[in-house]
A protein has these predicted regions:
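Active-site-proximal helices and loops of the catalytic beta/alpha 8
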Residues: 30-36, 40, 44, 50-56, ...
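Secretory targeting and sorting signals
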Residues: 1-28
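Short glycine/proline-rich turn/loop motifs
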Residues: 31, 169-183, 201, 305-308
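Core domains of carbohydrate- and sulfate-ester-processing enzymes
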Residues: 130-175
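Alpha-helical scaffold elements lining the catalytic groove of polysaccharide deacetylases
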Residues: 182-194
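Active-site cleft segment of glycoside hydrolase catalytic domains centered on the general acid/base Glu
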Residues: 171-185, 212-223
């Protein structure tokens, strides 16, 4: 008798792979080989709903939120979220109460929450009133424990001119943003208190924004303070360190206090997909210029790279979808899917009300891409969870645009970046049976809503 199983197999065409697995119980957040998602500029109420309705059922392990702290009011640009005015949890994305409710809802759905933490700097504005009503001026930011004054900022008051100069990168200003003196015990404690406040709301970990601009020793001290507390002991951290050849500051420096995002992975993936050279990806995980797999946060794009063209983005159509399938199928790193909104202007923020609040995301209408709901992402999250713990097996390629590989006896994926169909019989390690292609559909109720592929007793 033929059977439809929740394993995995792929097909031809531009992107194919398989199986939808049930969500596993919530673990301690990454790293646990459950993929995450960044819901960029989504409101807290929208994220809460998405955790319950989509992320939990799909098997996502965690969600990264945009920075939750009070920010400068400049206009509708997305980057105002990255210009802190105070560490109050109040922003154009929602209130403290809404953030706490979101964390509770997500954890109830088996999804942990990671906050994007801006700790390198305050705003780049000369003065004004923050989103929550906090007045500020150049190098003067009030706070509940005294806030920051001129003595709490680095002596270099000019912008970074050379990324070959470590001192400039870590002590001067990043595009005019007022650079905090993170070597100061006072500043370190202020930042640690902010992070612990988020932990008290149930936040599981942090993406440290602009970590490259903070000396690694300073971050180790700050995060050491957080982890010295009972509530912060197991907090997860992934650093944003944009590595570039020939520069003195590299991601590996920051592994003492957390994992690091692997930008080289995303750049390389773009190049190989767009040049139809998927075959060269076979040994990607062993390349010496990449971080060890268990320390690398990987992505196809993030909010910066989708705007500067450094990586693929939703604007690249099929190439982008194919790259996400590969990332979620290939055994390297801790993957995160990026899901933001469509834009034509680099600075354009998410849709907002007349008073500046970001509007709740609406998938299927409006400008939010909802890329995390696509079959190539949501169903592949299930695939990755189903094959967790298996290694790469049965690699095949045609020397160029076509590749296929297995994940032990649990899954198999075939990808074709070429312009013509790839048709062949593949050797797999799968038990005999009928398998559901989860890019064209999904396994549901013992049946397959997409293409079914049969594997014989020899695994072909």
């Amino acid at each position: 008798m033929r059977r439809v199983t929740a394993a995995a197999l792929a097909l031809v065409l531009a992107a194919a792979a398989l199986v939808l697995a049930a969500a596993r119980p919530a673990a301690a957040g990454p790293p646990d080989d459950r993929p995450g998602v960044t819901l960029f500029q989504w409101t807290w109420t929208s994220i809460a709903r998405e955790c319950t309705d989509v992320l939990g059922p799909a098997g996502y392990g965690w969600v990264q939120t945009s920075p939750p702290q009070e920010h400068a009011v400049v206009g509708g640009q997305w980057w105002t979220s990255y210009q802190p005015v105070s560490y109050r949890i109040e922003s154009k994305l929602g209130t403290r109460a809404e953030y706490a409710a979101m964390v509770s809802a997500c954890r109830g759905a088996g999804v942990e929450v990671i906050a994007d933490a801006v700790v390198n700097h305050m705003s780049g504005q000369t003065g004004g009133t923050g989103w929550a009503g906090t007045p500020f001026s150049t190098e003067r930011y009030p706070g509940p424990a005294g806030g920051y004054g001129p003595q709490d900022f680095n002596d270099c008051r000019t912008n970074i001119a050379s990324y070959q100069d470590r001192y400039q990168v870590q002590h001067c200003r990043l595009v005019g943003l007022q650079d905090l003196r993170t070597g100061s015990e006072y500043v370190r404690q202020e930042i640690a208190d902010y992070l612990l406040d988020l932990v008290s709301l149930g936040v599981r970990g942090f993406r440290v924004d602009a970590a490259k601009h903070v000396p690694a020793a300073d971050l180790e001290a700050i995060l050491g303070t957080v982890r010295a507390t009972p509530q912060g002991r197991d907090v997860y951290v992934v650093h944003e360190v944009i590595g570039a050849g020939g520069e003195p500051i590299q991601p590996s420096e920051y592994l003492g206090s957390g994992d690091s995002h692997e930008f080289s992975y995303a750049r390389h993936l773009k190049g190989q997909v767009q040049s139809n050279q998927l075959a060269s990806l076979r040994d990607l995980r062993t390349q010496p210029w990449l971080l060890p797999s268990d320390r690398a946060g990987v992505f196809v794009d993030n909010h910066d790279t989708e705007r500067n063209g450094e990586t693929l983005s939703y604007k690249n159509g099929t190439d982008y979808r194919l790259a996400n399938v590969f990332m979620l199928a290939y055994p390297y790193g801790w993957p995160s899917v990026h899901s933001g909104y469509a834009f034509s202007d680099h600075d354009a923020g998410a849709p907002q009300s007349g008073s500046g609040e970001v509007l709740d995301a609406a998938c299927g209408q409006g400008t939010f891409t909802c890329a995390h709901r696509w079959n190539e992402t949501a169903h592949m999250v299930g695939f990755r969870n189903a094959v967790a713990g298996t290694d790469l097996t049965q690699w095949w390629d045609d020397g160029g645009s076509g590749i296929a590989f297995g994940r032990g006896d649990r899954g198999y994926v075939a990808l074709n970046a070429g312009s013509s169909a790839l048709t062949r019989t593949f050797a797999t390690s799968l038990p005999a049976g009928a398998y559901c292609d989860v890019v064209s559909g999904q396994a549901s109720g013992g049946a397959c809503t997409g293409t079914t592929v049969t594997v014989d007793g020899s695994g072909r």
